[in-house]
Curated annotation (Swiss-Prot):
Cross-referenced SUPFAM superfamilies: P-loop containing nucleoside triphosphate hydrolases, Winged helix' DNA-binding domain
List of residues binding Mg(2+): T71
Positions annotated to bind ATP: I25, R26, G67, K70, T71, T72, E133, D134, F135, R176, Y186, R223
Protein name: Holliday junction branch migration complex subunit RuvB
Subunit structure: Homohexamer. Forms an RuvA(8)-RuvB(12)-Holliday junction (HJ) complex. HJ DNA is sandwiched between 2 RuvA tetramers; dsDNA enters through RuvA and exits via RuvB. An RuvB hexamer assembles on each DNA strand where it exits the tetramer. Each RuvB hexamer is contacted by two RuvA subunits (via domain III) on 2 adjacent RuvB subunits; this complex drives branch migration. In the full resolvosome a probable DNA-RuvA(4)-RuvB(12)-RuvC(2) complex forms which resolves the HJ.
Gene Ontology biological process terms in this record: DNA recombination; DNA repair
Amino acid sequence: MIEADRLIAATHSPREREEVQDRAIRPVSLAEYIGQPTVREQMELFIQAARGRSESLDHTLIFGPPGLGKTTLANIIAQEMGVSIKSTSGPVLERPGDLAALLTNLEPHDVLFIDEIHRLSPIVEEVLYPAMEDFQLDIMIGEGPAARSIKLDLPPFTLVGATTRAGMLTNPLRDRFGIVQRLEFYSTADLATIVSRSANILGLPLDPEGSFEIARRARGTPRIANRLLRRVRDFAEVRAKGHITKSVADLALNLLDVDEHGFDHQDRRLLLTMIEKFDGGPVGIDSLAAAISEERHTIEDVLEPYLIQQGYIMRTPRGRVVTRHAYLHFGLNIPTRMGEMPVVDEFLDAVDD
């Protein structure tokens, strides 16, 4: 499966026109930023303090599942600081010279945004350490016995790193971030507000009930909510005179095979495979990947997080296990052996703690 082909994929859409629309509906200030109240309040405080001292903001690490607004928040930081932002990604920075070219072109207090920062090569990461800590760049000139190292002073800048896999960051890199923010899945109410705002910007007639129906199937992810809004708009324009109501949204999303929990065919296939082929688990991640013909990282990074967060799957030392919630979702009888397992509410409480 190609992840970008999923309607409820949290990764970026490859369609150029939709990317332009995405940029149009992104908030550009903390005042417009919806959800993540703790992150928003903290960043507002840190930014005001840095501006009051006429300093650059501390280096900031933003992590969390795809589609929650890490890139948007990085751009907001630059906007609120009144500086420019230069964006790149970890895989693009193949050589130290690639990073050096970006760093030497920064103005004082500018923001350098590195997406997928966990994918930086070790040799590039080594160059980043003194740049972050001392605002200096170590460059090797010459080769062989004539090679020598010189230090270039850099203007004070803010590195904003974004990652979906904070655990893959090396300790030396993680320790150099003064601000660390985790983005959580959004509530349905916040997503409904985001959908309504996007519809207003795009000029779409949308009822509050329609926005809520889209929001509750968006897997707690703004990027998915906006993508569903565009597909429901297509349905409404062809079959409902362009007006999006609750019933129109329901019909459109059912046609698109997105159920009331935000699951699509891939989610249901994963759960049913665990139930039917592995007796509910435990099952190892490699066996599960082979059974559904998926890459291991796709299951870990794309499919699992939301299913775990919603209490349909548990990770145990012996492997993945479905909860009774998964059996109930498909109308299946709960095995008697699951009577020994924690109920879903207790499991979710344990996750929250």
